[in-house]
């Protein structure tokens, strides 16, 4: 069983990592190709392309200029410790033990516009490049064309290494934007997508902030409980969520909570 997550826009490179162990991204050459393309953009181009402020555009143009194919402790940080958004608040990787991080390294993958797919302990240099960005490139009009089958092929390879655990299942805890880079016809696995709904206004609905955090919390649950069989995820009961069998089907597992009447 392998879990995929989305990355985060917010990054933390100020807090020193509490662990030194790391691995390197496996698509560095492909990332370098994207960086070369991004370096051709002026700040105003980046602001328009990514719909961000001029200040953020300047920051990211600087990041592209500083990016190096040589990853070091001075310019990089482990991905799972560098990302700093709602999903990663739920995952709370900084409090995971060394053994927890080792399990996460085998069972969690982070989809990335720049890096394709990252393992939790892969060193990562700071960047902003969302998967849905329409950055034209030699392969086509966007990043889905750029990555093609490569991300899915690497996920297949990683899952094959877990075959001894018994379940060739990909648990999709990523957003729709990011999971679109995974190609179903190439993927050699069953896909389960957990969905988190909260009671509000007289009905259950997905509330983005809560759903993002819950995805990270479920990933943490899988790590700390050493989950290798997806059926074990039905026991997930953190923060008041519970599996709702009636609202679920084989591919879409719904978890609901009711904090208000």
Curated annotation (Swiss-Prot):
Pfam families for the chain: H2O2_YaaD
Which domain of life does the UniProt lineage start with? Answer: Bacteria
| InterPro entries, per database record | YaaA
Q: GO CC annotation: what is one?
A: cytosol
- Set out the biological process GO terms recorded for this chain's protein: response to hydroperoxide
The family note in this entry says: Belongs to the UPF0246 family.
Q: Specify the protein name.
A: UPF0246 protein Rmet_0978
Annotated source species: Cupriavidus metallidurans (strain ATCC 43123 / DSM 2839 / NBRC 102507 / CH34) (Ralstonia metallidurans)
């Amino acid at each position: 069983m392998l879990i995929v997550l989305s990355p985060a826009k917010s990054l933390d490179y100020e807090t020193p990592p509490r662990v030194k162990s790391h691995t390197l991204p496996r698509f560095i050459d492909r990332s370098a190709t994207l960086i070369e393309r991004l370096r051709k953009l002026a700040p105003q181009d980046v602001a328009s392309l990514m719909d961000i402020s001029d200040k953020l555009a300047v920051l990211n143009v600087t990041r592209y200029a500083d990016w190096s194919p040589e990853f070091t402790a001075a310019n990089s940080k482990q991905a799972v410790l560098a990302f700093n958004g709602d999903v990663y608040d739920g995952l709370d990787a900084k409090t995971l033990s060394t053994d927890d991080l080792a399990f996460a390294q085998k069972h969690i993958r982070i989809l990335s516009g720049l890096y394709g797919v990252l393992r939790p302990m892969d060193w990562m240099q700071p960047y902003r490049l969302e998967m849905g960005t329409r950055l034209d490139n030699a392969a086509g009009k966007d990043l889905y064309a750029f990555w093609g089958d490569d991300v899915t092929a690497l996920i297949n390879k990683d899952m094959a290494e877990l075959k001894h655990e018994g379940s060739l299942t990909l648990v999709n805890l990523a957003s729709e934007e990011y999971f679109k880079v995974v190609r179903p016809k190439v993927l050699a696995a069953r896909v389960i997508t957990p969905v988190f709904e909260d009671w509000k206004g007289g009905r259950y609905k997905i509330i983005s902030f809560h759903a993002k955090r819950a995805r990270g919390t479920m990933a943490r649950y899988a790590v700390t409980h050493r989950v290798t069989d997806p059926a074990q995820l039905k026991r997930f009961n953190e923060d008041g969520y519970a599996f709702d069998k009636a609202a679920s089907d084989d591919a879409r597992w719904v978890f609901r909570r009711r904090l208000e009447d």
